[in-house]
């Protein structure tokens, strides 16, 4: 059997300085720097994965500048995306509350071919820092109320939960690409990455 290629466009959005560029660099190149310059407009990276013996996944990662939510360009950037990651800084409550605006902007401009919202993970980044400005209960409630696929804490600096979270997103996109699109009865739940990379805490 010949190999099958899957190409997915994944948006990485959120306020400035929450770690979007760091996430893209960590995931695509396994590198981290404290000295990234602020993204202007949009930046791109490619991640290629041997998903199975006969399937290759190519992720086109779109790192969208935090200021772009206030421009009309987001509709162009969002076009044809298969999934999204919305990030916030757990030590900054404003970036958390603004995640709702990013999600609303996304949902108003982008849907799957069947009209459903695209899969979207909420990443609580910089979890290695303290104190947190929001509680886990707040994040959990927020994720469910705003229609996220799920959420988890991440530390790009310490490379915590990055590959695991992205795997959950890829699995969701792969299911969608085979037209097995079913709404989860429970959405927005915390993604338990410790027990199994693709498990949901509600299961």
UniProtKB/Swiss-Prot annotation:
Annotated keywords: Cell membrane, Cytoplasm, Cytoskeleton, Differentiation, Golgi apparatus, GTP-binding, Lipoprotein, Membrane, Nucleotide-binding, Phosphoprotein, Prenylation, Protein transport, Transport, Vacuole
A GO CC term attached to the entry: plasma membrane
Main location as per UniProt: membrane
Phenotype for residue 62 to A: Abolishes interaction with LRRK2 and reduces membrane localization of LRRK2. Impairs RAB29-stimulated LRRK2 kinase activity on RAB10, RAB29 and LRRK2
Keyword ATP-binding: no
GO biological process: cell differentiation; cellular detoxification; Golgi organization; intracellular protein transport; melanosome organization; mitochondrion organization; modulation by host of viral process; negative regulation of neuron projection development
Disulfide links within the chain: none
Residues bearing the modification Phosphoserine: 72
Effect upon mutating residue 73 to S: Loss of LRRK2 binding. Does not stimulate LRRK2 kinase activity. Localized to the cytosol
Gene3D superfamilies from the UniProt entry: P-loop containing nucleotide triphosphate hydrolases
Gene Ontology MF term list: dynein complex binding; GDP binding; GTP binding; GTPase activity; kinesin binding; small GTPase binding
Binding-site residues, GTP: 33-37, 39, 126, 156-157
UniProt site (Cleavage): 41-42
Alphabetical list of PROSITE patterns matching this protein: RAB
Membrane topology value: Lipid-anchor
Residue list for modification Phosphothreonine: 71
Motif placement: Effector region: 36-44
Tissue and organ distribution: Ubiquitous.
Record family assignment: Belongs to the small GTPase superfamily. Rab family.
Function description: The small GTPases Rab are key regulators in vesicle trafficking. Essential for maintaining the integrity of the endosome-trans-Golgi network structure. Together with LRRK2, plays a role in the retrograde trafficking pathway for recycling proteins, such as mannose 6 phosphate receptor (M6PR), between lysosomes and the Golgi apparatus in a retromer-dependent manner. Recruits LRRK2 to the Golgi complex and stimulates LRRK2 kinase activity. Stimulates phosphorylation of RAB10 'Thr-73' by LRRK2. Regulates neuronal process morphology in the intact central nervous system (CNS).
PANTHER family referenced in this protein's UniProt entry, alphabetically: RAB FAMILY, RAS-RELATED PROTEIN RAB-7L1-LIKE ISOFORM X1
Protein name according to UniProt: Ras-related protein Rab-7L1
Organism from which the protein derives: Homo sapiens
Encoding gene per record: RAB29
């Amino acid at each position: 059997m010949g190999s099958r290629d899957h190409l997915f466009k994944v948006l990485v959005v959120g306020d400035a300085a929450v770690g979007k560029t760091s996430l893209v660099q960590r995931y695509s190149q396994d590198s981290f720097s404290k000295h990234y310059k602020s993204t202007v407009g949009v930046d791109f990276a490619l991640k290629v994965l041997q998903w199975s013996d006969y399937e290759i996944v190519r992720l086109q990662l779109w790192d969208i500048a935090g200021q772009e939510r206030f421009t009309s360009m987001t509709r162009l950037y969002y076009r044809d995306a298969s999934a999204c990651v919305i990030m916030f800084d757990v030590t900054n409550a404003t970036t958390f509350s603004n995640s709702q605006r990013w999600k609303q902007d996304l949902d108003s401009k982008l849907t799957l071919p069947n009209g459903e919202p695209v899969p979207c993970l909420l990443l609580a980044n910089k979890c290695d820092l303290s104190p947190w400005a929001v509680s886990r209960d707040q994040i959990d409630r927020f994720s469910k109320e705003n229609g996220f696929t799920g959420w988890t804490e991440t530390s790009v600096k310490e490379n915590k939960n990055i590959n695991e979270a992205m795997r959950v997103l890829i699995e969701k996109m792969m299911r969608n690409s085979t037209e097995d699109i079913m709404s989860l009865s429970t959405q927005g739940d915390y993604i338990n990455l410790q027990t199994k990379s693709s498990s949901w805490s509600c299961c």
